[in-house]
Amino acid sequence: MIVSAMEKAEILVEALPYIKDFYGRRVVIKYGGAAMTDCELKQKVMQDIVLMKFVGMHPIVVHGGGPEINQMLSRLGIQSEFVNGFRVTDAATMEIVEMVLGGKVNKEIVAGIHASGGKAVGISGKDGMLIQAHPADGSGKMGFVGEVQYVNPELIEKVIENGYIPVIAPIGIGEDQQSYNINADLVAAAIAVSMKADKLVLLTDVPGLMMNPADSNSLISVLKVSEVENYVQEGIIAGGMVPKVQCCVEAVTGGVGRTHIIDGRVPHSILLEIFTDEGIGTMVVNE
């Protein structure tokens, strides 16, 4: 028991310089993957976020919700079609997406943060014209899939100023008041740039970027922007990792200090990344 207590003390001491460095800083967390569907992991993510707030950081949560959307569409007998990883979103699907993300998933995260001792406010990108969007596809084949045109940080600033953690659903609004379904990674990157965040953390279902996915020891701990193009050509950055790396590149070239792709299946992965010397996952830097 004495050893255990000493180990806990050492962990706190190791975290001290990071707590000092990130006091008052903004960290955008893209919350998705297994960490949203596994109850134990979900609770640990909520605890991580609340702890960050209590040690003086300003976490900003952007969430996905693909599995929940799939469940609701299936229940209603609506089939989903995907093109290059994006859900084709017609009017009926858009209505369901907005309902599930803004009305169900968002509020569950807010409730989870409150249950862990924190204070949160759930908002959609439509609130306060937070995320202004336009169609991602000019041909119209993707329906109401959107791209971020502009982020208005005023509402997020007000939420933070009043001591709350912003929890943001990735729904945008167009000039014609049309709702748009936007990839949560893209929204997180755009918000990180707009808020001049020090970190962007993407929770995924993989350890990070792997030189060889079949080799668990081939994790690329640091990825430089200058290396990305070659890695794409070599097939090292492929599949679902392509848009995540692109989001990280957009963020760090837009002024965000560091971006991280980490394994949300690891308990307390956010704390391990931010408050330990070793960190986890892949850090993308503008070098």
UniProtKB/Swiss-Prot annotation:
Q: Where is this site: Transition state stabilizer?
A: K30, K244
Q: Which organism is it from?
A: Syntrophomonas wolfei subsp. wolfei (strain DSM 2245B / Goettingen)
- What keywords tag this UniProt record? Amino-acid biosynthesis, Arginine biosynthesis, ATP-binding, Cytoplasm, Kinase, Nucleotide-binding, Transferase
User: Which major enzyme category is it?
Assistant: transferase
Where substrate binds, per the record, is at G65, G66, R87, N181
Listed under GO biological process in this entry are: arginine biosynthetic process via ornithine; L-arginine biosynthetic process
- Keyword DNA-binding part of the UniProt annotation: no
Q: Which SUPFAM superfamilies match?
A: Carbamate kinase-like (SSF53633)
The UniProt entry's GO CC annotations, sorted and at most eight, read: cytoplasm
Name the family.
Belongs to the acetylglutamate kinase family. ArgB subfamily.
Q: What is its EC number?
A: 2.7.2.8
* Record's protein name: Acetylglutamate kinase
